[in-house]
């Protein structure tokens, strides 16, 4: 699981989800990638599930890069707790993903294999995404 080694504060405010992504909008490492089309909070478990789906499909060929990191804690009160009594305990870690952000990249495999591996990863993510290529844009 992806979590920060240490943070300055245990609890944080929820990040703003509006607006387009200001950086990380292009493919830097691989040949193909997944680009988000809607804002969402992606949890560390969702990132891990997408990574496993891709790596199991490509088997030993190719390489996968994860370009987002869950650096924000999301807090939650226990089920059945009454309102009030402060902010809840940190429940899980999220990455704030805005539209246009490239989240995963894949390289070293053919276009057909990359397309299917990325499609399987998209099924694990909570927002609408598209598959893009380094030189051609949308596939």
UniProtKB/Swiss-Prot annotation:
Keywords: Ribonucleoprotein, Ribosomal protein, RNA-binding, rRNA-binding, tRNA-binding
InterPro entries linked to this entry: Ribosomal_uL16, Ribosomal_uL16_bact-type, Ribosomal_uL16_CS, Ribosomal_uL16_dom, Ribosomal_uL16_sf
BP GO annotations: translation
GO molecular function: rRNA binding; structural constituent of ribosome; tRNA binding
UniProt GO cellular component terms: cytosolic large ribosomal subunit
Region feature (Disordered): 1-22
Entry annotated with the keyword Ribosomal protein: yes
Role of this protein: Binds 23S rRNA and is also seen to make contacts with the A and possibly P site tRNAs.
Family (UniProt): Belongs to the universal ribosomal protein uL16 family.
Protein name: Large ribosomal subunit protein uL16
The organism of origin for this protein: Bifidobacterium longum subsp. infantis (strain ATCC 15697 / DSM 20088 / JCM 1222 / NCTC 11817 / S12)
């Amino acid at each position: 699981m992806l979590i920060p080694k240490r943070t300055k504060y245990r609890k944080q405010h929820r990040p703003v989800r509006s607006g387009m992504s200001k950086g990380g909008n292009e493919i830097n490492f691989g040949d193909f990638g997944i680009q988000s089309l809607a804002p969402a909070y992606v949890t560390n478990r969702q990132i891990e599930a997408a990574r496993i789906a891709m790596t199991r499909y490509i088997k030993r060929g190719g390489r996968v890069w994860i370009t987002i990191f869950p650096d924000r804690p999301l807090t939650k009160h226990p089920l059945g707790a009454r309102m009030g009594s402060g902010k809840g305990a940190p429940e899980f870690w999220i990455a704030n993903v805005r539209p246009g952000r490239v989240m995963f990249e894949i390289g070293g495999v053919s276009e057909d294999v990359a397309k299917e591996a990325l499609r399987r990863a998209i099924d694990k993510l909570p927002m609408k995404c598209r598959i893009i290529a380094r030189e051609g844009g949308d596939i």
